[in-house]
Amino acid sequence: MYIIGGKIVTMEGDVWENGYICIENGKIKELGPVEGKAPVPALVEKFSSGKNEVIDASGCIVMPGLIEAHCHMGITEEKKGMEGDDCNETVEPITPYLRAVDAVNPMDAAFDDAVRAGITSAMIGPGSSNVVGGSFVFVKTHGRSIDRLIVKNP
């Protein structure tokens, strides 16, 4: 698969106004600036030879996914009010037995918001009002099953 024509921003700080990314087997194989100033339709034709899928990213910024290092996404649910709030357990000041993985609702609208904002993974934890609030879980943000979203669950 090729992503072409967008503004490519790399982790190393390189920026190409008209760049391309080659992805094979889910991994970035190659990336760089498009040589010359060929119009995107001509590039699509060039890159789409064979079985290559081509995404025209003209007018878009293409960059690595962002990581949310600390949040309560899916625990303090958007639009649910108190019924969807599993964030803070107020019965004790120390609650190390709480596990975020048990409270996260991957159907929460916050997951869709995160994906649209470029956040590809997040460290989600229980409340912030307790001295010890429980254990966090590190998840991908795209998907609907918590079991499939988990990257690391201590």
Regions found by a protein language model. Name each.
Residues 44, 137-154:
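Metal-coordinating catalytic core of metallo-dependent amide/deamination hydrolases
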Residues 60-126, 130:
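Metal-associated gating/positioning segment near the N- to mid-region
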Residues 20-22, 123, 131, 136-138:
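Short beta-strand scaffold segments in enzyme catalytic cores
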Residues 22-27, 130, 142-145:
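Short acidic-glycine loop/turn motifs at beta-strand connectors
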Residues 48-50, 118:
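Short, structured coil segments at secondary-structure junctions
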Residues 2, 52-56:
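Conserved beta-strand scaffold positions in the cores of enzyme catalytic domains, especially
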Residues 1-47:
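N-terminal metal-binding scaffold of metallo-dependent hydrolase/deaminase domains
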Residues 16, 93, 132-134, 152:
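Short, solvent-exposed loop/turn segments at the edges of secondary structure
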